[in-house]
Amino acid sequence: MERNDFDIECFPNEIITILYAFNGTGKTTLLKLIDAVSKNDAIALGSFLFKRVELIFDNGKNIAVEKNIPNDKEYNYYIDGKLSVEPEEIEKLKKGFKVTTIFANKDYNRNTSFPKKTNLYENKEELADDTFIATVNPIITLRRYILNMLNEPEQRTKIEQLKNIINENFPMTFKHLEIENNHLLAVPDPEYKEIDSSLELDVLSSGEQKLILMFYDLLFKANSNSIVLLDEPESSLHLDWQRNLLSSVMKICEDKELQVIVATHSPAIVEEYYCLQVPMISARYKK
């Protein structure tokens, strides 16, 4: 196993830090390690090959995970250099350090979740059917969740915000999102009057659905004043959407005071925010 040593420093005064590198250089693995360390996820930490991972925060707090043998499932967990950490201290740390992970492609079905509402389903059979459908296409569950939440003022405000952000990215599709009869639907633009039917979210293209789910996660899942790990958000998106993506992400982050670490290999994403990128170059390649 080749050794890769990375020292990644986030920009302290910036909302977004971009990890930019080729495929296979460990971007996704690094994000998953950060997530696992923050939660002390024993299963995940046991599955990764590493010697030491250390997270250092602006307030001086320090978390480290260390293995004597990289492929060993056993590891030592340190908080501020202290090895013998009480379970209560770890739980306190978790509550004060929230991480939301948004992974690309197949991970989306696993990571996109929706609050359970007792009045969302009329019977157990419908719940079972929808659980199966959500595994295949979470946009269907999102559609039903939105229907349930539109009557709650705070949630409706977030849904309106989701609608507005998506509409900023949708002009090239000749459609926009509207709330009609307590449904969030895709509606043809006015100049296309011959197309008078609205579209449910689940019949939109994979890229359109991906965009909606991604911004849903940022608005509804990410806790205020927390860290968001965003992995390869460019997947399935047109180049123009890739170029505009981070400006939309920044609007949400400013409102919720989030810090985002983005892993990408898309030049379209990096070109507008070149000054925020941190190249992932292994120590052995540095001169």
What role is predicted for each listed range?
Residues 40-208, 219:
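Phosphate-coordinating catalytic segments in nucleotide- and nucleic-acid-processing enzymes
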Residues 1-68, 184-287:
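Switch/communication elements of ASCE P-loop NTPase nucleotide-binding domains
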